[in-house]
Amino acid sequence: MFFSPNSKYNLKGIDDRFAQQIDIYPTLTDLIGYNKKIRSWGRSLVSDKNEDAIIVNSDAINEQMIIGNYIYIFNGKDVTGIYDRTDLALSKNLFSKNLNPEQKLGILKTKAWYQDYMDRVINRKLY
């Protein structure tokens, strides 16, 4: 829940987009008018940049990422599952040799996010 007296942000009603904790920092920087560069894997929920969301969850074995219309299961090396984003039970794995362009891009984004994250953890660059 966010508040701003600035009507520019139109913070009334319910926003049904997927969001997560990593979106708080960039959202707050926009709300307070901070316009210097920041490092975040999240996105501002009040920006008009229309940034794509990447929702990340981990069970300490696999990363689960929601990107676009799909949920990707990643084991640290390979994507092992692709599910429709409405298939929250992960019951129908769509992973196949005939991936559509969105799924191929989602796999690349999954691996890129993980590589960037691990590089920053290992090299102590989480700033």
What is the predicted function of each stretch?
Residues 1-34:
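Substrate-binding rim/cap in mid-to-C-terminal beta-strand-loop elements of soluble/periplasmic
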Residues 36, 41-127:
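Phosphate/adenylate-binding glycine loop and adjacent helical scaffold
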